[in-house]
Amino acid sequence: MPSTVKKQPRNAAAKKSAKSSVVPDMLDANVSVETNAQLIARRDLAVPRGVASTAPIYAKYAENAELWDVEGNRYIDFVGSIGVLNTGHRHPKVIAAAKAQEDQYTHTSFQVVPYGPYIDLAEKLNALAPGDTPKKTLLVTTGAEAVENAVKIARAATGRPGVIAFTGGYHGRTLLTLGMTGKISPYKKDVGPFPSDIFRAPFPSPRDGITVEDAITGLKNLFLTDAQPERVAAIIIEPVLGEGGYTPVPFEMMHQLREICDKHGIMLIADEVQAGFGRTGKWFAIEHSGVVPDLITVAKSMAGGYPLAGVIG
């Protein structure tokens, strides 16, 4: 039977669907708002170019997996603030918890006047982390801060300076974590020199033709040429490579890293800042391999959109 529905031109249909049929109250109010173009012009005068933005729109409201800009256009948010919103925008439980806390106090500095929720979260993270050994958790603010503290912990525990990271890895944008990050553009360009005692091994990548055997051989060659294993404090790796191509570490690779670390007294750090908290179907991506790291760094989706990070181990 022929359709009785009149078809719209593709462009017209796309424009119509971009406008929300259920506009949130705050967008439906009869108030004057700036356009995306006006905000872009203001931004160009007030914000450094180094703070890049991908989308030429400005957010006004968000709910679950959807976002509305200041002009009322509705979008599906596939980015989730780069892995920060595994629970979606404005999850009711997250909002309720934040409001309840605001009614009590906002900050006391745990080092000055400690508070119970810090301990509550530490206990939960200790219980969730893989492995049967007792654990403790340090809480900080950002993923880069968590990674830096993991390095400090490894250096203090082993008395060694060296850190081995992998090609394509991303660990943050502070000076130390940039030194560990395995790509130049856009973060490392023209901002060196970087800290010493940071070494890089090849990441096993089918896309780049690098096998697990190649990667392990590269790591062992590094021990022979640049990084004396007795002076290496930690090997850090993302169980799922993030900015380097979203490539999972082969389980065989992870097991061999564990064996190498055990042999040389090196701490294995799993950087779960992007991959953690359910993004791979388990609390932590490294759980799929069955390998237990010495330290786990966490951030992003742990707090459902609020700045919170930690080191578990």
Regions found by a protein language model. Name each.
Residues 2, 6, 15-313:
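Conserved N-terminal phosphate-binding loop of PLP-dependent enzymes in the Aspartate aminotransferase
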